[in-house]
């Protein structure tokens, strides 16, 4: 018998994964435009936007859009690093935007890796690392964004499908015993 995973199970697992990552300081769920970045004080932020659920013969795929972002700081007194003097064409402003892109991309790849490899799930209470409860497949397109919001903020966004088993059993559906046919 399959222990079907619900939307809450999947979402709470993603949030728990974010909580255990030492660089992620805040999490949120919902429409990305509902985030009030002016009130947010702790970054890096991982935001989960649920997009859809698709069914297979014996599985559900919960689809999410995941944002990993941090604040960009600009200071008038900053000077360019002499080690990067050859890369001045790449660095147009005196800010930490390049570092933010670098760090948030690493967090994104960490997050994908935790879902691709069941070892992480084993550390979180699953006895057999060969029996993942949640997993993902396919390749991912990770897209950068910057200044998408009111604050100077940048990071990466990607779409991910979380596959879980579901046996679509009909024995415990809360309906009356009578048939539905006329």
Task: Name these PLM-found stretches.
Residues 1-59, 123-127:
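Small/polar-rich, solvent-exposed N-terminal microdomains that initiate assembly or binding
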Residues 52-55, 73-76, 118, 122:
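Amphipathic alpha-helical interaction segments
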Residues 1-8, 94-98, 102:
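Charge-dense, low-complexity intrinsically disordered segments
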Residues 58, 76-79, 171-173:
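Short conserved micro-motifs at the rims of enzyme active sites and ligand-binding pockets
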Residues 58-74, 87, 151-166:
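Oligomerization/assembly interface segments of phage tail-like spikes and tubes
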Residues 74-100:
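A solvent-exposed, charged loop/short amphipathic helix patch at secondary-structure junctions
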Residues 156-182:
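A hydrophobic membrane-anchoring alpha-helix module
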Residues 37-42, 97-163:
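Acidic-leaning, charged glycine-interspersed low-complexity segments
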